[in-house]
Amino acid sequence: MISQAYPLLSSIHSPADLKKLSLHELELVAAECRKKVIELVSQNGGHFGSSLGVVELTVALHYVYQSPTDRIIWDVGHQAYVHKILTGRLAQMETNRRYHGLAGFPKRSESPHDAFGTGHASTSISAAAGLAAARDLAGRKEKVVAIIGDGSLTGGMAFEAMNHLGDTKSDVLVILNDNQMAISPSTGGLKNYLVNLTLNKTYNRLRKFVWDSLSLLHNEIGETAKTAVHRIEDGIKAAFTPGAYFEALGFRYFGPIDGHNMEQLIKALREMRQLHHPKLLHVITTKGKGFKPAEENQPKWHASVGGFDIETGKNVKAPGKPAKPKYQEVFGEALVELALKDPTITAITAAMPSGTSLDLFQQAIPSRCFDVGIAEQHAVTFAAGLACGGFKPVFAVYSTFLQRAYDQLIHDVALQNLHVVFAIDRAGLVGEDGPTHHGAFDLSYLNVVPNLTIMAPGDEQELRNMLYTALYDIKGPVAIRYPRGSGSGATLHKEFTPVPVGRGRILRDGKSVALLGIGTMSNRALETAALLEAAGLDPLVCDMRFLKPLDTEIIDMAASRCTHIVTIEENSIIGGFGSNVVNYLHHAHPGIKCISFGLPDAFVTHGSMDELYREVGLDAESLSGKILEFYKDKP
């Protein structure tokens, strides 16, 4: 029972219930929240370290502020589990990241306490600025708070928003959750004195009095005096705290303070409520706080893909299933193999070295591996510069995050026909992370870009071969898309074999209906063909490999043998592989019947891969049933 395991937490049905508690009871609530997050992620997986790091901050925020009237926005949303627990969703947390359960990120349709949906980094301050502008235009008085991590502050969008907010003078609080992964806090007794000073009510009242008094002076004298006083204040802060930069953007800076000290957090947040201009509160937290393995290895425990043993911290693996190599690992190892022999190969990541397996490159050849932070736009143009300088840059990036650099891909890379390789990870569905992280659109948004070669491997060995081909057999920009997680278990060969550019391959000969798959959906086509064969059909199965250039010869062959052609892709049904095939058939073989299967024109929810494939109709059983119905319609 929840009430027995979490006696205080089970009595919290909304943030209003927190306001009845003493400081000691709030600290007990925080301890129960931390215990619940550890238990939850050990069972369901999910983002772990960030949520443990903001437990006290979340409790203090909901104690001081009035959610959902006050708007609280969590950047990225990795750290929002405790927020969900405290806003009436404790009993539902067992369903977190599960099919038809709670989302792993803030979601407006899930709760009025989720003021803004997130999943990608660096968006919170822009959203807060918009919410504050809407409040001011409507004449309302609610508070707006954005919580952003130091990693997300490497994204240019965050600084664009701060630059704008500082100019508007709007009442917004930005909380910098600094878990010391990117920004190093200053130390020392004088720093602590200044922290206490900036949060002191008397200091802030005196500061306001001095400012108001200077405003009464003659304009020229008053402004001169203000400038002098401001410079003195800024100089002292700049010497002992990292706040000068934020003050230059128009924010009052407070901190840094201990993000695990409930009393200090509440004091600071109460003071923030009294200030009616842009302000930034710098909070120092420990990622993974309260779980020793996560504190000792923060990058590893950023998220847990599956369950783990709470006592040992070791992953719990399903019995009897030998591990197959992951596409990410195969890519990372292959790139290192090639780069050790070729000094012109460079690797680029946007703050995702471990997720993309570029950490292998970092360890082997650190001088040629560049982590640019959460800055995909910069990463792409940086890669373009490397290509202009005679190097072969490989930018490894999740499909959903490459969307953020679309202009740079077109304008800075493709337009100049530069040899940049885009290794597009997490293409297709990604499971429990859901719609913010599915790679559902890359074939579509890349399809229209001139000069770009686009390919998708059907297995791990194909990925190795395509990487080699992209680096040595193609002169312009290249995109290779591959899915998350384990491969098919294909035999890996040490040598690299070039893939003929623009050529597919026949996986199964046949003549009744042609199944054209791209990427790992070619394997799904084979599974489907087995079911169709049992139903009396003789399917032709082709792995098309390339979206651009499209292998029209293999399509011509299929059209000459079969009356029906089926395309299968793990990408939006609009504008991708199927669209290209249908367009070609319309002009070259107008009598051939064709049907396309892919992801629907909708945002696919979260859940296990099997559950999601069934929902969108990309499992072999659903496909075979629909194809049999389609085949009954003779031309």
Curated annotation (Swiss-Prot):
Keyword Magnesium attributed = yes
Q: What class of enzyme is it?
A: transferase
- A GO molecular function for this record? magnesium ion binding
Which cofactors does the annotated protein need, by name? Mg(2+); thiamine diphosphate
Q: Please list the coiled coil stretches.
A: none
Identify the EC number(s): 2.2.1.7
The UniProt record gives the binding positions of Mg(2+) as 150, 179
Q: Which residues are involved in binding thiamine diphosphate?
A: 78, 119-121, 151-152, 179, 291, 376
Cofactor binding note: Binds 1 Mg(2+) ion per subunit. Binds 1 thiamine pyrophosphate per subunit.
Q: Which UniProt keywords apply?
A: Isoprene biosynthesis, Magnesium, Metal-binding, Thiamine biosynthesis, Thiamine pyrophosphate, Transferase
Catalytic activity field = D-glyceraldehyde 3-phosphate + pyruvate + H(+) = 1-deoxy-D-xylulose 5-phosphate + CO2
Offer one example of a GO biological process linked to this entry: terpenoid biosynthetic process
Q: Which Gene3D superfamilies match?
A: 3.40.50.920, 3.40.50.970
Listed under GO cellular component are:
cytosol
Q: Which CDD domains match?
A: TPP_DXS (cd02007), TPP_PYR_DXS_TK_like (cd07033)
From the UniProt record, give the pathway where this protein acts.
Metabolic intermediate biosynthesis; 1-deoxy-D-xylulose 5-phosphate biosynthesis; 1-deoxy-D-xylulose 5-phosphate from D-glyceraldehyde 3-phosphate and pyruvate: step 1/1
Signal sequence annotation: none
Q: What does this protein do?
A: Catalyzes the acyloin condensation reaction between C atoms 2 and 3 of pyruvate and glyceraldehyde 3-phosphate to yield 1-deoxy-D-xylulose-5-phosphate (DXP).
Family assignment? Belongs to the transketolase family. DXPS subfamily.
Subunit structure of this entry?
A: Homodimer.
Q: Which NCBIfam families match?
A: dxs, PRK05444.2-2
Protein name as annotated: 1-deoxy-D-xylulose-5-phosphate synthase
Organism the protein comes from:
Chlorobaculum tepidum (strain ATCC 49652 / DSM 12025 / NBRC 103806 / TLS)
